[in-house]
Curated annotation (Swiss-Prot):
Name the UniProt record assigns to this protein: Large ribosomal subunit protein bL28
Keywords on record: Ribonucleoprotein, Ribosomal protein
Membrane-spanning intervals of the chain: none
Entry-linked InterPro entries: Ribosomal_bL28, Ribosomal_bL28/bL31-like_sf, Ribosomal_bL28_bact-type, Ribosomal_bL28_sf
Listed NCBIfam families: L28 (TIGR00009)
HAMAP family (UniProt xref): Ribosomal_bL28 (MF_00373)
Naturally occurring in which organism (per UniProt): Nitrobacter winogradskyi (strain ATCC 25391 / DSM 10237 / CIP 104748 / NCIMB 11846 / Nb-255)
Gene3D superfamilies, sorted: Ribosomal protein L28/L24
One example GO MF annotation: structural constituent of ribosome
Length: 97
């Protein structure tokens, strides 16, 4: 299981832990990942993702899970999220047309 957000592609960063005497030792800054179940209103189904808490705020800000996926870049999404995005686009196109 990778330590990468499936919606925003946040990944671990590398830096230094600096002591009072300025001795630097390598450390990793890990993203705050949580397992969340999102409900797609368009598909009428629920989907589980491992996302950062930053992504949770972004989903709320953009008006829900479906709206977030439709506005998100494919380069940031996981393959599972891209497939879901395509399904939502097809369903909305069929509904509109």
């Amino acid at each position: 299981m990778s330590r990468r957000c499936e919606l925003t592609a946040k990944a671990p960063l590398v830096g230094h832990k600096v002591s009072h005497s300025n001795i630097k030792t390598k450390r990793r800054f890990l993203p705050n990942l949580v397992n969340v179940t999102f409900v797609s209103e368009t598909l009428s189904s629920s989907v589980r993702f491992r996302v950062s808490t930053h992504a949770l705020r972004s989903v709320d800000h953009r008006g829900g899970f479906d709206a977030f996926l439709l506005k998100a870049r494919d380069s940031e999404l996981s393959p599972k999220a891209i497939e879901l995005k395509r399904q939502i686009q097809k369903k909305q196109a069929a509904k509109a047309g």
